[in-house]
Amino acid sequence: TGVLERVDARRAVLACGHSARDTFAVVHGAGVAMEQKPFSVGVRIEHDQGAVNRAQYGDAAAHPALGAADYKLAVHLPDGRSAYTFCMCPGGEVVCAASEEGGVVVNGMSRFARDGANANAALLVGVGPEDFGSDHPLAGVERAAFEAARSAGGEAYQAPAQTVGDFLAGRASAAGASVRPTYARGVAWCDLRACLPGFVADALAEALPLLDRRLRGFADAGAVMTGVETRSSSPVRIVRDDALQARVEGAPDDAPESGLYPCGEGAGYAGGIMSAACDGLRVARALASAFEPR
């Protein structure tokens, strides 16, 4: 709305989402202690849902009692990295998850019936602090991927995409695929290596054939990868003390309490809906106990 309002409070819960980079910057600028944490970067991969059904159900794939099949895959690579699928959406679609103007970040969802033509899932590679290139809490590996995706996407909010076959062959995609992308804003065919950190792209290329052994057709040449997926968890953690309150950078142990309670995914203490809810309960109890008579 553009309306700014100041509300004074002795205590406040900071439960921002894991995409709230502007909030992270404000909190860091106020002197609150923050640290890097591992997170993941990758793409959304789409397959024909019928092919996934056949791979999972075999001859029973057409049985009316069976719904759209799902999967959960992971592989440990020789260099110590891992690649895995996350938030698999049977009969779903790839959606825009931008949280700022002009942003290009993707996520996935399924409607209640799960009856869409495609299956999709995040295909991710773990990223650790050693990959950041800086010890600054907002070092920005995910930001670099975000900016590259915005550049490669072309038109406003279009997402970069590539077929699995072209990605593994090391060539840019220039036309459509046998699997039609569901991203509503449209895709710009390209080479996704231009949008991803090199080690992420290399890990995906190594992982795809291995994951295909676990789910036949996973590395099908006509499958589509749409970028970038960086929203599986927060890249930072706001440091909390034993009372679950934020700490001011460099403050002594006997410093006055801050009254600020970082909570949930954005604060770096959860990695999904259920774990965020559990952390919310912890923070609510800590906040309530602060008002109990001493």
Where are these regions (language model features)?
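Residues forming the flavin
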Residues: 1-294
